[in-house]
């Protein structure tokens, strides 16, 4: 099919080439032979009057013109897929949809477990692929490579829609035998002590690291781990401290000895966990259904936390649990 002289099938080829960056892999991804993909490149070059790709070994290196075309091409193909090809009434009980979601281990444990249990009842054939943090969430959303990001709101894209899930705050955790931690933790105490810290991605700071940087502060990290749930073992029997979301700290304290202490609040205000999705997915029935479940389960998390927060006088925590 041609539109103003352009064979629209060539856009599919261009998108595959930009994604795979290898001729054979790109051809395979859209069920073309390698000669057919080579012919598509020739036709693309003729239409756009640009080389589009050069070879560097076996890898295709896009030209600036190809880089400029790629976002619009991917968005157009995604829009066609969502609004025309896959636009069917969504029946959760009969759907075998798979959702790709980026979220932290904290949100997996304290929030997403609830979602999975509920979906198993309402849509038993629906599946999830949970992915680690990426340093380029904007790019993943733009390409439609993920269905949802569940992140602190401060790290979300400004160009895609989002919805609040619930508010959270940080606390300091340590081994009950920690001899260096004072009852009232000052910011000087906090930054001078040895820390166990969670890291997400190669370049993205954690929330607490981001907050410290905003105040020009830096802590002394003795052990870095790839997630919050790996922190407690590295506190046991040491004078190290760590920074955890309150809900997660209370969850751990039910099973292992933990001392929980308030953090200096001007440095560590409450933050918002939110869900974000690609803008073209906004009217997708499956995405709408999933978002509704997220919001309903988040309200239950918020409600169940209110009782605990009230018992702890909203901001005062025991020094040891």
UniProtKB/Swiss-Prot annotation:
Species of origin: Bradyrhizobium japonicum
InterPro entries in the cross-refs: LysR-type_TF, LysR_subst-bd, NodD_PBP2, Tscrpt_reg_HTH_LysR, WH-like_DNA-bd_sf, WH_DNA-bd_sf
Any one GO MF annotation of this record: DNA binding
Similarity annotation: Belongs to the LysR transcriptional regulatory family.
UniProt cross-references to CDD domains, sorted A to Z: PBP2_NodD
Entry keyword set: Activator, DNA-binding, Nodulation, Plasmid, Repressor, Transcription, Transcription regulation
PROSITE patterns for the chain: HTH_LYSR
Name listed for the protein in its UniProt record: Nodulation protein D 1
Pfam families xrefs: HTH_1, LysR_substrate
